Amino acid sequence: MELKCRINGEEVVLCAEPTARLRDVLYKAGCHSVRDSDDAEGFAGSDTIIFNGELKYANFILFYQTEGAEIKTAESLLNGRELNYVQKAMVAAGIVQSAYNAPAAALILTWMLEKKPHPTREEIKEVLTSIFIRDAGYEHYYLAVQLATELRDFGEFKSEIAPSFRPHLEVVGKPCGKVDGAALVSGEPVFVEDKVPENAWCLHVLRSPFASAYIKSIDTSEAEKLPGVAAILTAYNTPETHYMQAGQGNPEPSPHDRRLFNMKVRHVGDRVAGIVARTPEIADKAAALIKVEYEPQGAVYTVEEAMAEGAPLVHNGEVIYNAGAPDDLAAFNKLAGDEREGKVVYQFPLGADIHKNIAASNKGGIGDIEKGFAEADAIVESTYQTSQIQHTPLEPHVCYAHIEHGRLVMNCATQVPYHVRRIVSWVCNIPENKIHIIKERVGGGYGSKQDILVEDLTGYAAWVTGKPVYYRNTRAEEFYANSTRHPMRVKVKMGGKKDGTITAIFMEVCANTGPFGNHCLTVPMNSCSKVLPLFAVDNMAYDLKVFYTNTPPAGAYQGYGTPKGTYGIMMTMAELADKLGIDYRTMVEKNHVSEGYMLEILKGLGEGREGNVVPVGSCGLDEAIAKGCDMIEWGKKEVSDDPDWKIGKGFAMIMQGSGLPGLDHAEAIAKLETDGTVILNSGGADLGTGLDTISAKAVKEVLKLPMEKITVVSGDTDSCVFDTGAYASSGTFFSGNASLAAAKNLKEKILQEAALQMDEKVEDLDVRAPGEVYSKVTGNAISYGDLSHAAIAGDGRGQMVAHGSYVTTASSVPYGAHFAQVAVNVKTGEIKVQKFYALQDAGTPINPEIALCQMYGASMKSIGHTLYEDMKLDENGKCINANLTDYGTPMIGEAPDDFKAVLIDVEDAYGPFGAKSISEIACNGAAPAIGIAIHDACGVWMRSWPMTPEKVLKGLGKI
């Protein structure tokens, strides 16, 4: 049908089906700010518009209802290309990060401020209940509103946006807004979905209803007859290449234990067939016509079931080692089962035994653990269990692939463009020079987009059909067909003396990797390697085993194992302090590491090889603990006016890493253009974290150019150079250092060229703002533009281009302490987080406003994991809450009443400008801090996630 309405002040005529969703119509009409994060569930708010003067979800309005309507989208906020006052304030406040629904948030806040020019905190909170923010948390949204009112009323910001650091630097350590902030908050077409042409074919995946079954037969004949079906891909017509989906560098530490399509499905939602069709409707019809005959097999869902005698085996095929094969491999492989099991290929030994469902194992330690326990006055041994958690990025997994000049070109939302290229090359048997990966802006990743979960099949489908192919996960598929956080059982035994000295620690970790071994060794290793080095204890040991099961797959998630290990060890430490009758704070301060302490425990905690033993570098633990204890008034017992509510306090010390020393590698190229501007090509992948801004700031500090004369191009495998990727908190440390190296090397080339053109000595020259070389001796100067123009003249020496590379074995470790005050209702079991304070040492925070928002966002995720989030599986392994509403992601109403993030000022010796990582560590503290606070309030030790009212009441003996 055809109808008239007004969109952003312009009368338009639109044509669509009467029952089409208005969101889809608006998006096709060019309103890219109106996005869909929840498949029309009405949870995320990414589709928010103003409809006849009121905020509405566009997915809830059908096309026929829009006749004569007045519609405004976020595009209406712009004046030409200029942002409105709310959008400017959002960028300044640091909340425009992955930004998939940032335009919707800007529209919501603008609408509110037009109705209520000076809203209260409660009024801001009320209007933001309609939008889900996963990346930046909610706290700085209050600041953004304050900044917006100041800009509107006074023409400038008056409030402090964030503390500033390093006064000798111009932009590093100062809030100045992201270089891509305007594009993101205004709704520019910067995401993968915005690059998909009208003629793209869709890819639909038919998935298994069984948790474990052999495929006996697949009949696709009727489906293939449908007009508009280009191909149906199955295990029968795709490569038998085994590979891993984990986006990790060489040597790959995850087993190659899957194909594009397996002859044995290993979880509900596993791939059975891929349908390339002209439209989603045709694909759905084709899927219904495919006839699959299954042979259901026994399944295991927990580590306890997986390790049981006679348990069904998740993998029971041939095992291959590319290095380090055991002597009994031939005998081992004689026990292999049905040929439909496939293979498991190891690049090196992982301590695996698939005949016991063990995907990986490792053990080690320092000192004499038994001697340490013998010296203890008290010993506590406790077990803590974590749940299966979904990342829930606002942008689901998505990929667009097409053929161009005989090459496979892929637009991806990925953290690891170079790993995507390598793995797609392997799966499709295409040389890497025939693959071009373009990393678009990423609408949230948190580790899930480190894994190659959709790019493998999308790329293959486009390559074999020659069609432009678009694939996008449904929100339900995000839960049952994607990666999740590894559920873990962490058992900690800890001994201590009466004075609080810890004499020994033993950690036993049992992790559930699901049906495939993505990150199966490295995530559980992190639960030890980013936890045990917090302790200055002579006797420590660990024993970890990782089990295959038939649950939805596990993979990388922000924190990467550390939140689970931290939860177990800090809770046990609090239990030990309680048993010894000493103050928990005293025990923490007595036993944590400090600068210079040699971390011998790291020797056994490498990724498949010996780890680097290094001393503790810059460490802000003392200050973080002391300041946090002052803020929360540690030692003061709070009493509620209502006797049913009991109040308690807790905290946890935390650490992470800054990339993987000895494994990670980053590169960048800096080019001086003919007008004196600079383009920096970085291999790094900005996920909304401000990495491109860090790179631009590095160039600014070195070359003294205005920020607007610096452009950063990143994550494009054709135009950029190699970078391991954005994971393991490597962005600032590795990619930032590579950009800094490129800028410094370009400065050297500029000075050398200037010395020739100016007839001066190089050592007499330097650079200064606004972009020129000057002589410290003669006072002569030449602009970068004049210098570059002359260099590329016919008799010049060519364009000045510099390469920067960064590798290191040095370790820059961020530290911190997270504090919680909770109230527990001893009648209902309800838990309220009243206060949450995150104090972190990040070295020099290059983008302090963005750093604070990353701390808020990661802390909110961690609070969600602790109290609300939990993937629930039925008895057949099917996820029964595969949507955002039922899953339990926290919204603004679940945010702590008093929420603060504090940057502890230390300077690191190795990071760019003294910086360390900031975001991932903030996932580690909430569970133990809240758990210890709950015990302080009501005496119950919460031994599993999520910490629910039912568990409180059970602990109190009331149910």
What do the predicted segments below correspond to?
Residues N316-C428, S594-T677, K697, I880-E894, ...:
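Helix-loop-helix junctions that connect adjacent transmembrane helices in secondary transporters/permeases
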Residues M1-I161:
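Signature of N-terminal electron-transfer/Fe-S-associated modules in redox systems
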Residues R271, R278-T279, K467-T513, N737-D766:
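Phosphate/diphosphate-binding loops
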Residues T149-R340:
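Flexible, low-hydrophobicity surface segments
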Residues R422, R441-G466, Y470-R472, L691-A698:
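Thiamine diphosphate
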Residues A235-Y236, N429-K434, V464-V469, K498, ...:
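C-terminal catalytic domains of large/alpha subunits in multi-subunit enzymes
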Residues G94, K174, D180-S186, N250-P251, ...:
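Glycine-rich loop/linker segments at domain edges
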Residues I49, K56, A183, P189, ...:
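Short beta-strand elements
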